[in-house]
Swiss-Prot record:
Keywords: Acetylation, Apoptosis, Biological rhythms, Cell membrane, Cell projection, Chromatin regulator, Cytoplasm, Disease variant, Glycoprotein, Glycosyltransferase, Host-virus interaction, Intellectual disability, Lipid-binding, Membrane, Mitochondrion, Nucleus, Phosphoprotein, Repeat, TPR repeat, Transferase, Ubl conjugation, Ubl conjugation pathway. Changing residue 399 to A: Reduced autoglycosylation. Reduced localization to the nucleus. One of its GO terms (cellular component) is nucleus. It is found in: Nucleus; Cytoplasm. Residues 991-1010 are annotated as: Required for phosphatidylinositol 3,4,5-triphosphate binding. Its main location: nucleus. The modification Phosphotyrosine is found at residue 989. It comes from Homo sapiens (Human). UDP binds at residues 849, 852, 906-908, 911-914, 930-932, 935. Pfam families: Glyco_transf_41, TPR_1, TPR_11, TPR_12, TPR_8. This is UDP-N-acetylglucosamine--peptide N-acetylglucosaminyltransferase 110 kDa subunit. The modification Phosphoserine is found at residues 3-4, 20.
């Protein structure tokens, strides 16, 4: 405000009076500068009475009245000054100040510009003009005003600092920095410039330089409140919490009632985990500033962290009453609603937060997470991308987007997201865990283990990472601290179930750990409830179901739902069943959850089912369920359970009146929306029915089935070469199979038919015997040619016009057949030498994935090998990284390395065929060989098993019971070892058992797909009749046996 009194020289009074006037004027000016406006006005009025036309006095009076907010009086005296001197720039500037204060910015600017035209070197005029231009939004004009002032006086460091502030606000940080540096060069002790420079460095991410400059500012001015606040803020962001606390406390010593500083200090306490202290400090901030929505929001965060969720919710609501557009409170309240299961309200609040603040990255990410949970993956992806666009270093958004892409089967996209999240935040435990899951699913187990371990180092209390690491270690048979690991895993599950959280152990893995039946069922139940949560948001009314078969012309409509209609073990087992249903009584629908993989398995099911619907083209669960209901399905069969590719949400919507679990998943669904589990008395004894959420529906023999007779008909017969010619015939050293085997054998001279004693299908191998004919080719030139082909690694030779193929080098002709699935068209030779198996040893085998082996199983196997000296164990590199671990543990148990032989995983046909070379299969009690059990039995190899308490541990016993080989089922560990040892040491007994298995696989119901289908139909009809009579689902444990002739 211009307040010059320098016009006294114009006075015509005598010198004495002039001196008196001059002294009074200087006194008034000093009082004005000191802020004693009352005294300054009193003395100025004396001066004005002496010289009413003195423009200096008029200017000072104008300034005094302006400072006292008496704007009209200020304007009056400025106007009087202008009347006295129309060229008085300071008067126009003072009048401009009045207009600016009244909000009349254009009038203010015009007066400032007029002042500067009158006096181009008027520094205060430029400064006042700059302030008015800023208020009017003309930032560039304000910059030019400051620049003009500095052209007249480059040493005005305060002005240069103000120019820097303006440039900083415009985002021109380098220019702002230059201004502050010049101000400091001019006045090195100018604390404000040091603080402002610290703000620029902070904005540029130069945290340490920012800290240095704020500290310099408070050193220069120990009472510089704003600098202490800025220092505290940057230290807080840098997570240097102790020093941040010290800075905020110093600020509070200067201004004890500064609510914002109390709020910021509380934030630091919160980050330090001092929740109670944070709560008290937030409450103090609110006490000082009751209408402080930020403080209420942050207080709510702390209360929520403490577990006071209801009080936190109240605080968020208070913040929103104070400020209905408080985006953080909307977002955080949505988080609470989400955790309470009120998903719709959560979505509404997230959307409201984004309506208020469209660039709110966290709200985009949170909304995306809920949308993902609802199955709205494309919309979720859009919001994650928005979050990342807004905040390119938002590691959580990258990690969560990776989860969505993973669910959409975009593995590479997910991998890139997790990798980027870790690049942004190397200490982001969740991202390391998610990356590990990608490696795990891709079979890169060592990388998965490393990433899970990194996650646990960063976040030791991380149940998901711990349980997934435990599963990875199980896959590769790393049993370091095995017992301790199992105890901790059980403890984690117990704690999660108690707190009603989703357990970190997946239902499909629960069979591998020493969990109680109640825990396993509860784990499945939680996952079933997740499906219900997803479908509840669809608000679909319940479907109305038919009570009779009128609309289907008296036929029962059965729908099989699976993601495995293709080259998958489930299709290998059941591919013929859809086409074997009685078309007069059943109408079969197959609902595929996965795209066509182009294999014959898919083609067969598509061709033989009455209807084949690809639901992978209908990603919306509601619409997919509508399609099933529109088809009028009576019994909907769940073949996935909780395996990869499942869509249990379809079943949660209940599009069919009866819903049953079958074949593809070895356990209970735990879900209220599944009525039955199709099983059998051996697999699921009635006395353990409480292990299942479903009602038990028994098949008369076994619930398991294999389509091996259709897929591998060339293995129905075999011939062997008597390579030793010592009178002892081995049926599994050099084996020939083929569709044209009989014709080939008829072309050979000297083929002997050896009658092998074969027990009938009784309870043991000593029951009445029948003879089994086995063709034996003696050692002659033909046999030698076959052996030479194998030894030289030839692919094929021709004998008597028949092509003879090396079993290790089979080729396929049909491109639509999955690799290794085609039935060989030649005579195929399989030998122990091809796999490095000793010719003169007893070969025990197990072709399961290695995760099914546990320390106690390997110990049993080691005991067996020790008791059968001339024996080896044949395992698969499934995966290869498990081989050295198994070998090391076996050596620790006293077994030389050469007693265990590993082979690579083979294509399906070779895998089944080479099973003929083993003498005995040793099943894994923890989780049996299910499909692999069927494979080895079709090869004619006996399987020793010991049923446990879970469904997964009793399947092999069910298969053997159906086969009529009860003597291979052990009641305990000792009996398991004894049975295996007897088979390995009593060669006559081994022959009898092998002969029995070879015979029974054809004559028993185990591989009789047609009979199985008829029995399954009888069970379906029983379910329907029970439902049609108005009954709720109930156990069906008295199956009706059906013969194929029926």
């Amino acid at each position: 405000m211009a307040s010059s009194v320098g016009n006294v020289a114009d006075s015509t009074e005598p010198t004495k009076r002039m001196l008196s006037f001059q002294g009074l004027a200087e006194l008034a000016h000093r009082e004005y500068q000191a802020g004693d406006f009352e005294a300054a006005e009193r003395h100025c009025m004396q001066l004005w009475r002496q010289e009413p036309d003195n423009t200096g006095v008029l200017l000072l009076l104008s300034s005094i009245h302006f400072q006292c907010r008496r704007l009209d009086r200020s304007a009056h005296f400025s106007t009087l000054a202008i009347k006295q001197n129309p060229l008085l720039a300071e008067a126009y500037s003072n009048l401009g100040n009045v207009y600016k204060e009244r909000g009349q910015l254009q009038e203010a600017i015009e007066h400032y510009r007029h002042a500067l035209r009158l006096k181009p070197d008027f520094i205060d005029g430029y400064i006042n003009l700059a302030a008015a231009l800023v208020a009017a939004g003309d930032m560039e004009g304000a910059v030019q005003a400051y620049v003009s002032a500095l052209q007249y006086n480059p040493d005005l460091y305060c002005v240069r600092s103000d120019l820097g502030n303006l440039l900083k606000a415009l985002g021109r940080l380098e220019e702002a920095k230059a201004c502050y540096l010049k101000a400091i060069e001019t006045q090195p002790n100018f604390a404000v410039a040091w603080s402002n420079l610290g703000c620029v460095f902070n904005a540029q991410g130069e945290i340490w330089l920012a800290i240095h400059h704020f500290e310099k500012a408070v050193t220069l001015d120990p009472n510089f409140l704003d600098a202490y606040i800025n220092l505290g803020n940057v230290l807080k962001e840098a997570r240097i919490f102790d020093r941040a606390v010290a800075a905020y406390l110093r600020a509070l010593s200067l201004s004890p009632n500064h609510a914002v500083v109390h709020g910021n200090l509380a934030c630091v306490y919160y980050e330090q985990g001092l929740i109670d202290l944070a709560i008290d400090t937030y409450r103090r901030a609110i006490e000082l500033q009751p209408h402080f929505p930020d403080a209420y929001c942050n207080l709510a965060n702390a209360l929520k962290e403490k577990g006071s969720v209801a009080e936190a919710e109240d605080c968020y609501n208070t913040a929103l009453r104070l400020c209905p557009t408080h985006a953080d409170s909307l977002n955080n309240l949505a988080n609470i609603k989400r955790e309470q299961g009120n998903i719709e309200e959560a979505v509404r609040l997230y959307r409201k937060a984004l309506e208020v603040f469209p660039e709110f990255a966290a709200a985009h990410s949170n909304l995306a997470s809920v949308l993902q949970q609802q199955g709205k993956l494309q919309e979720a992806l859009m919001h994650y991308k928005e979050a990342i666009r807004i905040s390119p270093t938002f590691a959580d958004a990258y990690s969560n987007m990776g989860n969505t892409l993973k669910e959409m089967q975009d593995v590479q996209g997910a991998l890139q997201c997790y990798t980027r999240a870790i690049q942004i935040n190397p200490a982001f435990a969740d991202a390391h865990s998610n990356l590990a899951s990608i490696h795990k699913d891709s079979g890169n187990i060592p990388e998965a283990i490393a990433s899970y371990r990194t996650a646990l180092k960063l976040k030791p209390d991380f149940p998901d990472a711990y349980c997934n690491l435990a599963h990875c270690l199980q896959i590769v048979c790393d049993w370091t601290d095995y017992d301790e690991r199992m105890k901790k895993l059980v403890s984690i599950v117990a704690d999660q179930l108690e707190k009603n959280r989703l357990p970190s152990v997946h239902p499909h893995h629960s069979m591998l750990y020493p969990l109680s039946h109640g825990f396993r069922k509860a784990i499945a139940e939680r996952h079933g409830n997740l499906c219900l949560d997803k479908i509840n948001v669809l608000h679909k009314p319940p479907y109305e179901h038919p009570k009779d078969l009128k609309l289907s012309d008296g036929r029962l409509r059965v729908g099989y739902v699976s993601s495995d209609f293709g080259n998958h073990p489930t299709s290998h087992l059941m591919q013929s069943i859809p086409g074997m249903h009685n078309p007069d009584k059943f109408e079969v629908f197959c609902y595929a959850l996965s795209p066509d993989d182009g294999t014959n398995f898919r083609v067969k099911v598509m061709a033989e089912a009455n209807h084949f619907i690809d639901l992978s083209q209908i990603p919306c669960n509601g619409k997919a369920a509508d399609r099933i209901h529109q088809d009028g399905i009576h019994i909907l069969v769940n073949m996935n359970g909780y395996t990869k590719g499942a869509r249990n949400e379809l079943f949660a919507l209940r599009p069919a009146p009866i819903q049953a679990m079958w074949l593809g998943y070895p356990g209970t669904s735990g879900a209220l929306f599944m009525d039955y589990i199709i099983t059998d008395q051996e697999t699921s004894p009635a006395e353990v029915a409480e292990q299942y959420s479903e009602k038990l529906a028994y098949m008369p023999h076994t619930f398991f089935i294999g389509d091996h007779a259709n897929m591998f008909p060339h293995l129905k017969k075999k011939a062997v070469i008597d390579f030793k010619s010592n009178g002892h015939i081995y049926d599994n050293r050099i084996v020939l199979n083929g569709i044209d085997l009989k014709a080939f054998l008829d072309s050979l001279p000297d083929v002997k038919i050896v009658k092998m004693k074969c027990p009938d299908g009784g309870d043991n191998a000593d029951s009445s015997n029948t003879a089994l004919n086995m063709p034996v080719i003696p050692m002659n030139t033909i046999a030698e040619a076959v052996i030479e082909m194998i030894n030289r690694g030839q692919i094929q030779i021709t004998i008597n016009g028949f092509s003879i193929s090396n079993g290790l080098a089979t080729t396929q002709i049909n491109n639509k057949a999955a690799t290794g699935e085609e039935v060989p068209r030649t005579i195929i030779v399989t030998t122990r030498s091809q796999y490095g198996l000793p010719e003169d040893a007893i070969v025990y085998c197990n072709f399961n994935q290695l995760y099914k082996i546990d320390p106690s199983t390997l110990q049993m196997w080691a005991n067996i090998l020790k008791r059968v000296p001339n024996s080896v164990l044949w395992l698969l590199r499934f995966p290869a990284v498990g081989e050295p671990n198994i070998q090391q543990y076996a050596q620790n148990m006293g077994l030389p390395q050469n007693r265990i032989i590993f082979s690579p995983v083979a294509p399906k046909e070779e895998h089944v065929r080479r099973g003929q070379l083993a003498d005995v299969c040793l099943d894994t009690p923890l989780c049996n060989g299910h499909t692999t059990g069927m494979d080895v039995l079709w090869a004619g190899t006996p399987m020793v098993t010991m049923p446990g308490e879970t469904l997964a541990s009793r399947v092999a016993a069910s298969q053997l019971t159906c086969l009529g080989c009860l003597e291979l089922i052990a009641k305990n560990r000792q009996e398991y070892e004894d049975i295996a040892v007897k088979l390995g040491t009593d060669l006559e007994y081994l022959k009898k058992v092998r002969g029995k298995v070879w015979k029974q696989r054809i004559s028993s119901p185990l591989f009789n797909t047609k009979q199985y289908t008829m029995e399954l139909e009888r069970l379906y009809l029983q379910m329907w009749e029970h439902y049609a009579a108005g009954n709720k689902p109930d156990h069906m444990i008295k199956p009706v046996e059906v013969t194929e002739s029926a």
